[in-house]
Amino acid sequence: MIYTSKKIIIFLFTIMQLAILASCMDSGYRLSFPEIDDLADEYPAQAKVFLSRADSNDNKGYYKLLTAKIEYQLKGYIYKENDIDDAINIFVNEKDEPLLARSLYYKGASILNNYRDTAKAIKWFAKAIAYDSNMREKEKLDMYNILCRITHQNIYTVELEDEARQ
């Protein structure tokens, strides 16, 4: 009886240790970069968590693009512009036009939001437009909305200047 109860206690203790050990381990569930990319469109905070679990060496350019995209979506600006610059260089070398177009868009958006330099931003958007047939629809629409907003602001500014001259 005592021998059996010791076996039961040891067995239960072993099961508890395994449960605790399993709960402390990483789940191991990782999303691929395209899945994280899709998730970032609607839920950038959750995408950031999955991106932190991803191996940045799998596809450095895509990883850096997603880092910049998620940061831009969460904060409205890109703090580390060297990530997007690295992504652009990688995609130019790999001749990956869809990801290059998206990287150029985020570079232009970053310049516009960080420095309010409309002329430089438009130059980057113009480079992205050269590849826009390969861009994702959401980013293409966002880019054209930004360009329309810039155009509208410029027209409004010209109208105000004309009124001021009169």
Regions found by a protein language model. Name each.
Residues 11-20:
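Bacterial N-terminal signal peptides
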Residues 24-166:
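A "functional boundary" signal
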Residues 2-12:
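Bacterial N-terminal signal peptides that target proteins for export
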